[in-house]
A protein has these predicted regions:
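Beta-strand-centric surfaces of beta-sandwich/beta-rich domains
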Residues: 1-340
Length: 340
């Protein structure tokens, strides 16, 4: 629960709301997210902090207003978000909008958490995004399809930004690994920072993984400040996201950890996504952070030397090797922005 003194304190910071992409109300001159276009959602001088990013579901404009464009049914999955701090030449964050909102491929079920939520027709992103000098948030539509949507960004103008406030950064990983033999190096962040949220999406055609079995294994190892042995190691992907015994409670969870997706987009494909938000259990580091995904110690690894894997239910289960697409996103705060 939020501290009562923070809740009752009279706020002296000026609040603003920037709206975009919706010319069907008071602002007919507002730009839309048309095919091949981009829309500047926020262009603001600092110091300040974005406190909420809200975006409606992206729909094809043809189907709503009967305009003409070569519609791509999944165009909304390809919309990009770019966030640039302090007039940097290149964006500090650049990725698919749906991934930024923790709605991987736009295919997650409805969910809610303290930092992210997906409701019937919109998304909300509540990780604070502080900036010292300037911030620019842009949406890009690289497709041939006109899209209709509504977006708003709430932010505060601050008198000062404390020196220990970090910039929101993202470490994004997307590779296909041969499991269990191949190890995934999901991130290697340099400098000081704090992890506040992360999600993972696992996709495979392995029939044994239809309900999340096999892929729920895998050790997540956090190596902090160059150490040789990880300070934090979860013995199971589901446990790294505060669940246990696989993904039986699909698309359930609490406000800090949620299984957001268990989908079979084809007769053989399984896609599972998990989200975790960190408050008191944030992960801080002073020099570096490295995250490794390792399945080599699991019961179905052919080279396992664990004697328990030769007994009981473990001995009866099939040893396999299979391709696994791993997508992982870490949201962290960094003091290194000025060095870019």
């Amino acid at each position: 629960m939020e501290d009562w003194m923070k809740t009752a304190r009279v706020d002296t910071d000026r609040s603003y709301l920037a709206t975009a992409c919706w010319p069907y109300d008071r602002f007919p001159e507002m730009s839309q997210l048309m095919a091949g276009s981009q829309v500047v959602v926020l262009d603001a001088q600092g110091p300040g902090v974005v406190t909420n990013f809200h975006s409606s579901r992206m729909d094809i404009l043809d189907e709503i207003l009967f305009t003409k464009s070569a519609a791509e049914p999944d165009a909304y999955r390809r919309v990009l978000i770019e966030i640039t701090y302090d007039h940097h030449e290149k964006p500090d964050i650049s990725m698919p909008l749906s991934a930024f909102l923790a709605d991987i491929d736009g295919a997650c079920d409805q969910f809610r958490s303290i930092y992210f939520s997906k409701v019937a027709y919109s998304h909300n992103f509540r990780l604070p995004i502080p900036f010292k000098k300037h911030i620019k948030i842009v949406l890009k539509n690289p497709t041939d399809t006109d899209l209709i949507s509504y977006t708003d960004v709430q932010w505060k103008k601050l008198s000062d930004l404390p020196a220990d406030m970090g910039y929101l950064k993202i470490a994004y990983f997307d590779e296909e690994l041969q499991i269990p033999e191949e190890v995934g190096h999901l991130c290697h962040i340099q400098g000081a920072g704090t992890v506040r949220a992360h999600w993972m999406n696992l996709g495979t055609d392995l029939d044994l993984a239809w309900n999340g079995e096999y892929i729920c294994e895998g050790n997540q190892q956090y190596y902090i400040d160059g150490e040789e042995e990880p300070s934090i190691e979860y013995c199971g992907n589901e446990d790294a996201f505060s669940h246990s015994w696989g993904f039986g409670d699909c698309c359930g969870g609490d406000l800090h950890a949620v299984i957001t997706r268990m989908e079979h987009p084809t007769p053989t494909r399984t896609e599972i996504a998990m989200l975790r938000c960190r408050t008191l259990d944030s992960i801080g580091f002073q020099k570096s952070l490295r995250l490794v995904l390792d399945y080599r110690y699991d019961f179905y690894a052919k080279d396992s030397t664990n004697p328990y894997h030769k007994q009981g239910v473990f001995a009866s289960r099939k040893r396999v090797s299979y391709p696994l697409r791993v997508r992982n996103c870490i949201y962290y705060y960094s003091l290194e922005c000025d060095k870019k």
